[in-house]
């Protein structure tokens, strides 16, 4: 079984396309409760880092749908999917929630990485999630976290939130200094 935690440096990157960092991916995917054979949706795939990690976890019997509206990010997701030799990731170019109608599978879990239009995207994603499935989101802004919590709660999810502050060690001439990254909210809930 594959566990998440691919080092960030292993992904092909482009300066203006955001990437969910390694430690946040690990926590978010654990909250998604992925398993071999699962069907998973990544809304706002960016670099494709979450889609790649998920694709490795769900394996050849599983399926990952990577949704992205930015053509450059779509291409970057494609490059990373190819780099990791994944055949179980389907990339869907377009705006969520509109393009989500292209997904006919019942999903086990979903990750929403973009924070625009949450009140529109979350209900459409929820319709595709099986009972007992998970929706996970990450957000930098408190307002986005509150919108996500409120929307999940309105849909009957037991919504929860954690704030994650990661500091990575950087070697200096005298030892290691801890360099802090941006705090991130991870919001998640199980469909009842």
Swiss-Prot record:
One Pfam family from the record: Methyltransf_31
GO biological process, any: anaerobic cobalamin biosynthetic process
Record HAMAP family: CbiT (MF_00786)
Family assignment from sequence similarity: Belongs to the methyltransferase superfamily. Archaeal-type CbiT family.
The protein's name: Probable cobalt-precorrin-6B C(15)-methyltransferase (decarboxylating)
Reaction(s) this enzyme catalyzes, per UniProt: Co-precorrin-6B + S-adenosyl-L-methionine = Co-precorrin-7 + S-adenosyl-L-homocysteine + CO2
Keyword list, A-Z: Cobalamin biosynthesis, Methyltransferase, S-adenosyl-L-methionine, Transferase
Residues holding S-adenosyl-L-methionine: 20, 44-48, 68, 96
Top-rank EC class of the record's enzyme: transferase
Originating organism: Sulfolobus acidocaldarius (strain ATCC 33909 / DSM 639 / JCM 8929 / NBRC 15157 / NCIMB 11770)
InterPro entries associated with the record: CbiT, Cbl_synth_MTase_CbiT, Cobalamin_biosynth_MTase, Methyltranfer_dom, SAM-dependent_MTases_sf
Keyword S-adenosyl-L-methionine included in the entry's annotation: yes
Stored CDD domains: AdoMet_MTases
Annotated pathway: Cofactor biosynthesis; adenosylcobalamin biosynthesis; cob(II)yrinate a,c-diamide from sirohydrochlorin (anaerobic route): step 8/10
EC number(s) reported in the record: 2.1.1.196
Top-level division of the source organism's lineage: Archaea
The UniProt record lists the keyword RNA-binding: no
GO molecular function, one term: protein methyltransferase activity
